[in-house]
Amino acid sequence: YPADHYDGVFIPNWAMWFVLELGEYAERTSDRELVARARERVYALLSYFRRFENEFGLLEKLESWVFLEWSKSNDLVQDVSFPSNMLYAKMKLVMSELYGDAALAEEAQRMQAVIRDLSYTADGFFCDNAYRRDGRLVLSGEYTESCQYYAFHTGTATPALYPELWQRLVHDFGRDRRETKKWENVHYANAFIGNYLRM
């Protein structure tokens, strides 16, 4: 999604954007017919992802090309990608609204709570990923600007929940951070898709 692939490589987490876009389309147009026609396909997508859910309800070891954005983020996608899981939780929330599925809303809220608990660190940022080590998830200790944007864009984080991080992103991050050299422990975002999420 959205294009044909001839070598069998695909981007599993990118299909989640289709569900978010369907939700935005329904909100703008009130086209319930299209939403109803998409139901089978949307739930098939959810069924595909179910097999990757771990004991925390988070996606782990997604197959093929896990794409987040053209930056360091793409090196930090295994074993548990927190931005992908933020997007997955948002996908479930949108599905719950589109199809009146209260169970999915509860799942999404649990996922967001788990992500906040596991990924947000004492450094004041969301860590991008965790590796499975001896049966436990261990944070990589890597932070990217785009991961922070995914957190707020998907509602996993809000300005009310993380006011310091929000202020930091608003005032210290953005186009001139390479010049100001603020927060050099956080890898820079790129135009696609991190800077779009910032907007």
State where each predicted segment sits:
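Active-site core of glycosidic bond-cleaving carbohydrate-active enzymes
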Residues: 1-199
